[in-house]
């Protein structure tokens, strides 16, 4: 066993044992240990330094007898004693720290726990700070229960801090008025309430190195990702006032061991570090400290933010604009009070994206399925540059332009022959809105105003705008929250006959029953043909589309195909309707239409639908987006469609190669106990697991593996760019399987 071997073991994703950690602690070559810990930090931990500040919102008169603490009423110290500060004082400190670039601000109070009255005041202080500041809020208020944690979380506090302080085997030597088990229950209550947890302790209170290692493993087993490391500052009047301070080598060794044991955690410099030399602080940052509490601390002197920043930047860490992002930019499907981490992209090229840190990730999502040609494509770049020199935008009402005309000419030969009219829109969701409005206005023109409702199938997804949400699954879909407010639609069961399986004739019976009973009020049936995307990544049998088309024709419904995700080759056919050979009355396309460069969608329909709308009052289709037919987007779309359909590009060959490779390389996932299903269609690969994934954990692990994959629910899937190289795709598939194995 060597230090280097244990380092490589950690870098490969395998934890060291307690015995191995004790062996590391005993090594005389400390520099080798420090450098190994440094490499683990640089490879696995965040290079973006995390700073937190605190306000001691209530001081002194604590009934607990913690031997290290100046706040305890059991000891005579010179610690300040004051009651809870008001919310304006809290806000003043929060805003000051926000201006200094500090990411988090923590409310800290002395005592076992606040009174009910003080809890209300603290919650109001948190709400007050959230109203007037965007700094992320933490709290350390003692031993709280889950109900109290929920109140804090509702007030805007997203992280709870409760130090375990030391090893389980040593805690009773330091405190007898509460137990470490009570602290652990507090942390579990915070997690149950939806908060992150922060927990560490104080080293140098008489514990052995073996007990520090025991402590580090306790935190690892609890999966704590923010670990404050305090150095005991013996305070006159406390039982530990004469405790011999640790020497700098022992402190640095402890930090290195904590990094080996908790390789991805934020190791947070907290109290007592002022006793270290500047050189020792620099070395601690080099070894593994990648977070700090700045400013004045609870019972010891802190440090100035500016001084900390200088040392931190000298150590090679960075402060990113992502703090502004966290505080002010609202990302899709993301909490503003407790946002998932975001990774700042500096450049994208081909099938890769490069982060601010310099790390390059293989792109597995095609930027939510639209960047089929990858990034920075010279053909699309040229089209955008050329068009922007002529005209970036002009209204489409009363005017037209060559890019819109040319795009229409390119699209019509690719879609069903009956599609003869094209309506340009802004996005996929808007395209669905347009399609639904077309269907209603069609029947209005036919004198059947009561035909204004819709039928669809469960587990579908059609977008985030109002009517689009109404035809998404109302129970399991992303928009179930709005169910009571949305128009009530009719939902048939999800088809259970797999694309690659046998057709069950009973699969469409419930759809038939609904249409038979309600056809007089139904304007249309809307479906994602063959592939249900964000609703569950399910691939169903083509015969279902044929049966759906038959029912629509028999009972007088329009048939709408939402091809926004499936269009332009993703399923192995240029459009998914081709799998069944059934033509819709209205068809929505988007996403890959511009190769992922710009937002643009289109709704195509038949002359019959367009004529019925146009020949009856009000004589026009009642829709007109501001950016409809945007020339810049149309020009790029023309370039993308030409590129895709050119013989040299050979999109079918590319998609077939990706499909075959996905089938081969994802097949081993079927043997994993946590995997329910593996399914492949065209350039789509899906692994369905048995439990909902931990999004934050899995996203971070994928980034650490050098791949960009964004799972949701129980689905981990790939929709790579068509231009991805085989070795890049192998990195994606192997990374997927590796991380899914870690879910055990």
From Swiss-Prot:
This is Biotin biosynthesis bifunctional protein BioAB. The keyword Amino-acid biosynthesis does not apply. Residues 44-270 form the Radical SAM core domain. SMART domains: BATS (SM00876), Elp3 (SM00729). InterPro entries: Aldolase_TIM, Aminotrans_3, Aminotrans_3_PPA_site, BATS_dom, BioA, Biotin_synth/BioAB, Elp3/MiaA/NifB-like_rSAM, PyrdxlP-dep_Trfase. (8S)-8-amino-7-oxononanoate binds at residues 368, 461, 591, 624, 710. It is an enzyme of class 2 (transferase). It comes from Bacteroides helcogenes (strain ATCC 35417 / DSM 20613 / JCM 6297 / CCUG 15421 / P 36-108). Homodimer. The record marks 333 as: Participates in the substrate recognition with KAPA and in a stacking interaction with the adenine ring of SAM. Pathway: Cofactor biosynthesis; biotin biosynthesis; biotin from 7,8-diaminononanoate: step 2/2; Cofactor biosynthesis; biotin biosynthesis; 7,8-diaminononanoate from 8-amino-7-oxononanoate (SAM route): step 1/1. It holds the Pfam family BATS. The keyword Iron-sulfur applies. Signal peptide: none annotated. It catalyses: (4R,5S)-dethiobiotin + (sulfur carrier)-SH + 2 reduced [2Fe-2S]-[ferredoxin] + 2 S-adenosyl-L-methionine = (sulfur carrier)-H + biotin + 2 5'-deoxyadenosine + 2 L-methionine + 2 oxidized [2Fe-2S]-[ferredoxin]; (8S)-8-amino-7-oxononanoate + S-adenosyl-L-methionine = S-adenosyl-4-methylsulfanyl-2-oxobutanoate + (7R,8S)-7,8-diammoniononanoate. Transmembrane segments: none annotated. One of its GO terms (biological process) is biotin biosynthetic process. [2Fe-2S] cluster binds at residues 106, 138, 198, 268. Pyridoxal 5'-phosphate binds at residues 428-429, 562, 625-626. GO terms for molecular function: 2 iron, 2 sulfur cluster binding; 4 iron, 4 sulfur cluster binding; adenosylmethionine-8-amino-7-oxononanoate transaminase activity; biotin synthase activity; iron ion binding; pyridoxal phosphate binding. Keywords: 2Fe-2S, 4Fe-4S, Aminotransferase, Biotin biosynthesis, Iron, Iron-sulfur, Metal-binding, Multifunctional enzyme, Pyridoxal phosphate, S-adenosyl-L-methionine, Transferase. The gene is bioB.
